[in-house]
Amino acid sequence: MVRFKSRYLLCELCVSEPSSLHLFEDKVVYQALRGAVNRAHGDYGAAIFNITLGVLVKYLNAHTGVVLIRCRKAHYRLVWSSLPFITFLENRGQKVRCFFNCIHVGGTIRTSQKFLIKYNRQQLQRMLLDCKTDAEKQDVRKAILSCSLNLIKGEETDGSDDDGDEEDT
């Protein structure tokens, strides 16, 4: 049995109106990604995307705008370089201007999840500086503490930090 090595692109979907995030589904992101690869890399990109790329939107959180895209290891740069060409997503007849911010490239879903926890904790710490009232600060501190406790519990049970990010050339 052959194992296909994959890369996971953890992206942040940035939109002008956060209320429009609930409109998106994974197939909308997939179609936009397919079109972007076609525009950026032409016939070669379209052929690679359809035949060998193995692109799949594994996770889309409509509340936070986090997208996890899986693609083959040999061609992940093709997808990665096409992300800036996505300027809007269209769903149910509505076009929403957006862009993708790739925040992590990992070898497994697990390493991407670990990075996302660390990233969210950093974002919460930045939010703490912007809080104006003591109640807001207390809520953000509780959120930071809950992220930290979950991370510590996960590291105690895991024991390994190997993410398999080595590349074959």
UniProtKB/Swiss-Prot annotation:
Record localization: Nucleus, Nucleolus
Biological process, per Gene Ontology: rRNA processing; tRNA 5'-leader removal; tRNA processing
InterPro entries linked: Pop5/Rpp14/Rnp2-like, RNase_P/MRP_POP5, Rnp2-like_sf
Coiled-coil stretches: none
SUPFAM superfamilies with a match to the protein in the record: Rnp2-like
GO CC annotation, single: nucleolar ribonuclease P complex
Pfam families documented for this protein: RNase_P_Rpp14
GO molecular function: ribonuclease P activity; ribonuclease P RNA binding
Magnesium keyword on record: no
Highest taxon of source: Eukaryota
Keywords assigned: Nucleus, rRNA processing, tRNA processing
Subunit structure: Component of nuclear RNase P and RNase MRP ribonucleoproteins. RNase P consists of a catalytic RNA moiety and 10 different protein chains; POP1, POP4, POP5, POP7, RPP14, RPP21, RPP25, RPP30, RPP38 and RPP40. Within the RNase P complex, POP1, POP7 and RPP25 form the 'finger' subcomplex, POP5, RPP14, RPP40 and homodimeric RPP30 form the 'palm' subcomplex, and RPP21, POP4 and RPP38 form the 'wrist' subcomplex. All subunits of the RNase P complex interact with the catalytic RNA. Several subunits of RNase P are also part of the RNase MRP complex.
Family assignment from sequence similarity: Belongs to the eukaryotic/archaeal RNase P protein component 2 family.
Function: Component of ribonuclease P, a protein complex that generates mature tRNA molecules by cleaving their 5'-ends. Also a component of the MRP ribonuclease complex, which cleaves pre-rRNA sequences.
Entry protein name: Ribonuclease P/MRP protein subunit POP5
Organism this protein belongs to: Danio rerio
Lineage of source species: Eukaryota, Metazoa, Chordata, Craniata, Vertebrata
